[in-house]
Amino acid sequence: MSISKAIAADLLEIKAVSLSPSQPFTWASGIKSPIYTDNRVTLAYPEVRSQIEGAFAELIKAEFPEVEVIAGTATAGIPHGAIIADYLKLPFAYIRSKPKDHGAGNQVEGRVAKGQKMVVVEDLISTGGSVLEAVAAAEREGADVLGVVAIFTYELEKANSKFAESGVKLATLTNYSELIEIAKETGYVTKEELELLKKFKENQETWQA
């Protein structure tokens, strides 16, 4: 089994990802979805956590070999980013969703030199808006952002478009397509539910259970 499928299987097993095609979830954006993800759950499982961080380290070495600093997004990207930085023996920083309203007013916390090559760590890619804002904040501070890595992506067209428009490279450990394939192989979903899950990928904006 590929590492991508192995991680997808782990996410299902520990219920970091929940699938409910017949009784969909409502995201904060208002989108009705057959899937809900809380990757913070992975931190509670040492073996899963270790596999994720090791896979992240290998992914970063392969896709962004020039990296000089790892940055996590607040808050979900911080623990993963810190562990990855430790794996790679690199400096770590984190990026707030907005600047502090007191003190120095920092949005990027840590020591990041001008022109330092950075990889930003996020746990989940939904529409991509928040992590691309974090990238912009890091670039305003002088970082040279090589790209973004994440555990999982819903593969939403909106996110794909935003990353393409911004020119920011995205690499993920696993994705929606791999996850529903594993769900099919393991009998996690019925054939009817699988069809609903496939339709969600085809058009998330108009999907209905």
UniProtKB/Swiss-Prot annotation:
Record's catalysed reaction(s): orotidine 5'-phosphate + diphosphate = orotate + 5-phospho-alpha-D-ribose 1-diphosphate
InterPro entries with a match to the protein in the record: OPRT, Or_phspho_trans_dom, PRibTrfase_dom, PRTase-like
Keyword DNA repair: no
Key words, A-Z: Glycosyltransferase, Magnesium, Pyrimidine biosynthesis, Transferase
Protein's pathway: Pyrimidine metabolism; UMP biosynthesis via de novo pathway; UMP from orotate: step 1/2
Binding locations of orotate: 126
Binding-site positions, 5-phospho-alpha-D-ribose 1-diphosphate: 96, 100, 102, 122-130
Catalytic activity, EC: 2.4.2.10
Cofactor(s) needed by this chain: Mg(2+)
A single BP term in Gene Ontology: pyrimidine nucleobase biosynthetic process
Gene Ontology molecular function, alphabetical: magnesium ion binding; orotate phosphoribosyltransferase activity
Transmembrane intervals: none
Keyword Iron: no
Family: Belongs to the purine/pyrimidine phosphoribosyltransferase family. PyrE subfamily.
Function: Catalyzes the transfer of a ribosyl phosphate group from 5-phosphoribose 1-diphosphate to orotate, leading to the formation of orotidine monophosphate (OMP).
Subunit structure: Homodimer.
Name of the protein in its database record: Orotate phosphoribosyltransferase
